[in-house]
Structure formats: structure tokens, C-alpha cells
Amino acid sequence: WMDCPLRLNLLSNNKSYVSHKVNTIKVGKDISWSDNLLRGIQELKNDYILVLLDDLLLKNKISNNYFNQISNWVTENNPNYLRLCISHKPNYFDDLIGEIPLVTPYKTSTMPSIWKKSVLKDLLKEGESAWDFEINGSKRAYNYDGFYAVYNNFISYKKIFCI
């Protein structure tokens, strides 16, 4: 996403990535996925964060026009979570975005998403892996409304696995 309008923050345990476009946040010793994320997001000042994990390769060019539509929607609707990829079809909310049911599997999917930082911090629990968070965090999120998903992929990706 060469012309990304966002300030990029890279969470790393100890290494730095030197670029004028990227701010590295070092979280220190690896304890767990959720501990690392909790430590990292405490450094962020924004109310909303776009979360992309390192095991995804972007497949297509990202549309800044579509991003601007999504960004405006977030500003107007104040969601707790907005999934940017299609997994489970959401219920109709408006022409751009659908609503994720209150109780649904993988409600807190780690797919590319925009999170209200305070809600993400509340749902993360120390010691959990990303997979634990998708299962257990989804159950904790049953108490939250305001979870949404796009009808059309904003980000198309290929998942990579390292052995």
C-alpha cells in the first residue's frame, strides 16, 4: 500500500525497522501474542487502530477511495470493530457495511480490521495466543454490540505459514 495515508506502527520484540514511513514500537521479551499487543497499543494515541498481522501478504492494490469511504463511515458510526475482509456474511446495516450478530463464531477475528482501541484492550487477556483470542475473545465480545464487517473485501490477502 504504497500511498497509505496512515501513520504506520510496527510492533516488534526488539528489532527496529528504519523508515521515515514506519514507527517501530519495541514491546520487549515475547510473553504471548496478547501481552505483546497490549504493550504495543498502549503506545498508540489514536482511538482507532487498523490491525494487520505479519502472516498476511497483500494480493491486490488497496483503494484509497474505498479506504476514505470506510474511514468516513468509522468517524460517523463509532464502531467497536470493523472487519475489512469477508468471512461470515454480515447482516444488512447500510449499503457499505454490515452488522456482525451479537453472538457469532470468530466475532473477534484477527483478519485485517479496525478496532476501537479501548474495546480491543478490554477484550485482550494476558497469556492468550491469537487463536485463543479468536475463540475466547469472541465469547467475551458477546457483551458488545457495534461489531461490523464490509460486504466487499477492502484488503485481499494470502495467508502464509512458516514451518
Predicted regions and their residues:
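Conserved donor-nucleotide/metal-binding helix-loop-beta segment in metal-dependent transferases, i.e.
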Residues: N60-P90
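Catalytic core and acceptor-binding pocket of nucleotide-sugar-dependent glycosyltransferases
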Residues: T108-I163
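N-terminal anchoring/stem segment of glycosyltransferases
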Residues: W1-K29, I41-E43
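Short, flexible, basic/aromatic active-site loop/helix in glycosyltransferases
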Residues: Y92-P105
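A structural signal for short, well-ordered beta-strand segments and their strand-loop junctions
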Residues: N9-L10, I49-V51, N80-C85, I114, ...
